[in-house]
């Protein structure tokens, strides 16, 4: 709760025009009374747009349109439960919710063909990334990511993994 209120306050201070949550805003597809009640204590910055990408923890069905984030949709916040893109003429902003391995297309370009104009906000597996004790074999390939967008921001992996200009993981 403190970190959310800090972010909402910082968004005012920095004159942001939107906040994008990269998935798993909630860590469970079911909320208890305490969690629902805590939502009242969030000091939302309603002067800007809020976009919430559905993560794997916010649903318990393969049809991610059934998700706990829909509760926030009641407050007129945007809930992204399918690949979506919006262009401002300079960049194409691409929003990619969690996609199960069996349903994932082979390439990001199949979702968003604009290449270098793309800025992708995602909550997905990435192949070749260290997840604690094991290395992911499923997900989008690093070479695919680096050739499909100008910037790729991903909320699924809970570490500080990055990809440098030479396409090396750091």
Predicted segment positions?
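Core catalytic region of metal-dependent phosphoesterases/phosphodiesterases
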Residues: 1-87, 145-149
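Hydrophobic/aromatic residues located in beta-strands of well-ordered beta-sheets
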Residues: 19, 50-52, 93, 118, ...
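Catalytic metal-binding/acid-base residues of hydrolase active sites
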Residues: 25-26, 56-59, 99, 125, ...
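Conserved beta-sheet core of the metallophosphoesterase superfamily
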Residues: 52, 132-170
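Conserved catalytic scaffold of divalent metal-dependent phosphoesterases
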Residues: 58-144, 167
């Amino acid at each position: 709760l403190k970190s959310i209120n800090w972010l909402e306050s910082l968004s005012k201070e920095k004159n942001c025009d939107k906040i994008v949550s990269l998935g798993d805003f909630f860590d469970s597809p079911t909320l208890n009374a305490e969690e629902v009640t805590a939502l009242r204590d969030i000091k939302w910055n309603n002067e800007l747009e809020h976009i919430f990408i559905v993560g794997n923890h916010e649903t318990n069905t393969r049809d991610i349109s059934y998700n706990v984030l829909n509760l926030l949709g009641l407050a007129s916040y945007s809930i992204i439960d399918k690949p979506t893109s919006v262009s401002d003429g300079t960049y194409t902003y691409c929003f990619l919710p969690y996609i199960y391995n069996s349903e994932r297309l082979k390439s990001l370009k199949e979702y968003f063909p604009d290449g270098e104009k793309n800025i992708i906000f995602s909550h997905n597996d990435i192949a070749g990334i260290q997840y604690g004790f094991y290395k992911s074999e499923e997900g989008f390939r690093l070479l695919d990511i680096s050739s499909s967008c100008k910037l790729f921001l991903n909320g699924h992996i809970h570490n500080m993994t990055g990809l440098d200009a030479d396409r090396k993981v750091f």
